[in-house]
Design a protein with these regions (language model features):
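Mobile-element integrase/transposase regions
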Residues: 1-25, 31, 47, 163, ...
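Short, well-ordered alpha-helical microsegments
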Residues: 75-77
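Short small-residue beta-strand/loop micro-motif enriched in glycine and branched aliphatics
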Residues: 31-35, 91-93, 117
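Mobile genetic element proteins and their domesticated derivatives, centered on retroelements
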Residues: 24, 30, 48-49, 66-69, ...
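RNase H-like polynucleotidyl transferase catalytic core
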Residues: 63-70, 85-103, 119-122
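C-terminal domain-tail junction helix/linker
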Residues: 86-88, 110-167
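Active-site beta-loop-alpha junctions of metal-dependent nucleic acid enzymes
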Residues: 10-11, 17-19, 35-60
Length: 167
């Protein structure tokens, strides 16, 4: 348990929380796709993008551009090759300028506050197991300020067609 839960920086648990959270957020709808993975290398980042593209496609979103930070996995040759072969334009943020990727950074703050640090999990596995339910809540039920209090999924479907997208 870390200081974000206890409020005391002197109290920490060792070995918990060293996974990497990969995040993809649709620019228009704010629909989010998230995976907790063991590293942020080129192979992992490329596989994440592949799965994220498929997930967004199932929700009617065609990925045309990807904006990433300059982490090693996102500047790898493998990641660049996947983007080229998929016809995805890869843009990178300016180094040390997280506001360039503000929508994703804001989502990450929400993710950390409402999921990762919401409570003290007994271990990383329990925290990771709680992610799908929170992500479903975020995409399907949680009101979003930039969307006038509506959840992200409402930008993609007519109100009477939610069952078709969710199944």
């Amino acid at each position: 348990v870390g200081h974000r839960i206890t409020g005391d920086r002197r109290i920490q648990a060792r070995g918990i929380g060293w996974e990497f959270v990969h995040v993809a957020v649709d620019d228009a709808s704010r629909l989010a796709y998230v995976e907790v993975l063991p590293d942020e290398g080129g192979v992992t980042a490329t596989q994440f993008l592949w799965r994220a593209r498929a997930w967004f496609r199932r929700h009617g979103i065609r990925v045309r551009r990807v904006l990433t930070d300059n982490g090693s996995g996102y500047v790898s040759d493998r990641f660049a090759r996947l983007c080229r072969s998929a016809g995805v334009r890869h843009l990178r943020t300016r180094p040390y300028t997280p506001r360039t990727n503000g929508k994703a950074e804001r989502f990450i703050q929400t993710l950390l506050r409402e999921w990762a640090y919401r409570r003290a999990y007994p271990n990383s596995r329990h925290r990771t197991e709680a992610l799908p339910a929170w992500l479903h809540y975020y995409n399907w039920a949680r009101g979003h300020g930039a969307l006038h209090g509506r959840p992200p999924i409402t930008c993609l479907v007519a109100p009477n067609n939610l069952v078709a997208v969710q199944s």
